[in-house]
Curated annotation (Swiss-Prot):
GO cellular-component term (any): extracellular region
Residue ranges annotated for the C-type lysozyme domain, each copy included: 1-129
Native species: Colinus virginianus (Northern bobwhite)
Top enzyme class: hydrolase
Record's keyword annotation contains Disulfide bond: yes
Protein name (record): Lysozyme C
Keyword Hydrolase: yes
Length: 129
């Protein structure tokens, strides 16, 4: 599913991401834009053999199990396929674990490079939330 910007913002808010660990909703929407272009079915292979999954491009080396990543830790205890659903519950629950891990949203390269220090509020402007 390719989400609309405000549609994804509303779903993220409903699942408790707004100000989770101090990150406003705009941060999460911005991260999703540059990680997956709001596409829940996005997958991208990394040079280390791991794959990133879903709207927040969650990585199979650490966070989920896809059955093909050597030494996968599966810290969110989920199959990676759960991260490709149009229901973002699994993605959000795993993202909460990731952002609590010590590096905050710096865990997302796209957030670090394209969202951090910018006017992320713009990503939810005009949305009825």
């Amino acid at each position: 599913k390719v989400f609309g910007r405000c549609e994804l913002a509303a779903a993220m808010k409903r699942h408790g991401l707004d100000n989770y660990r101090g990150y406003s909703l705009g941060n999460w929407v911005c991260a999703a834009k540059f990680e997956s272009n709001f596409n829940s079915q996005a997958t991208n292979r990394n040079t280390d053999g791991s794959t990133d999954y879903g709207v927040l491009q969650i990585n199979s080396r650490w966070w989920c199990n896809d059955g093909k990543t050597p030494g996968s830790r599966n810290l969110c205890n989920i199959p990676c396929s759960a991260l490709l659903s149009s229901d973002i519950t699994a993605t959000v629950n795993c993202a909460k674990k990731i952002v609590s891990d010590g590096n905050g949203m710096n865990a997302w390269v796209a957030w670090r490079n394209r969202c951090k220090g910018t006017d992320v509020q713009a990503w939810i402007r005009g949305c009825r939330l």
